[in-house]
Amino acid sequence: MIQSNLNMEKQDLLICSNLKPNQLPKLLDEALSVAAEGETRDMLLLSLLTNCAYALPAMRMLHGRPHHIYSPELLTMIVAPAASGKGIMNYGRLLLQAIEGNTGKKVYIPANSSASALLKMMDKYDGRGVVFATEMDTLTQTLRAAYGQFGDIVRCIFEHETVSQLRRQNNEFIEIRNPRIAMLL
């Protein structure tokens, strides 16, 4: 079971590993067949859901008062010790390899990208992509480095707020309206 920081009883948490066959779409059921029960299955399901969002470019939903329009990209962090099976998340990437191959567009954005590289990739691919790393350290070390300080960009991505950058050297202006980036760490 994925741990929660909320004060909830164990029985109140969604335990993905207890899902019965046919409770999920067939694609997800079949993809989960490679995982053992328990936490490994939970991690794979979260990876699949985070990656699936990229394949739903036209999906939007209203949430909150006043209503805000959101898309289904998830920002997912799985916290677990080393050698705990987080590598199973790589199977979620298989869902999108066909999209990368057929369109020529890069889906995945390296978690150790600089802030400028992140914005350039977002600009090149219409504000869409998936930041993926099986180790959260990849991103946290990048955020601490001078070149990778893009915590503000991640917060804007979460709310689908416009992100922009102006570089004096080349008079380069980048603006991404309604960024739709999923993150899996």
Descriptions of predicted regions:
Residues M1-L185:
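Phosphate-handling catalytic cores of nucleic-acid transaction enzymes
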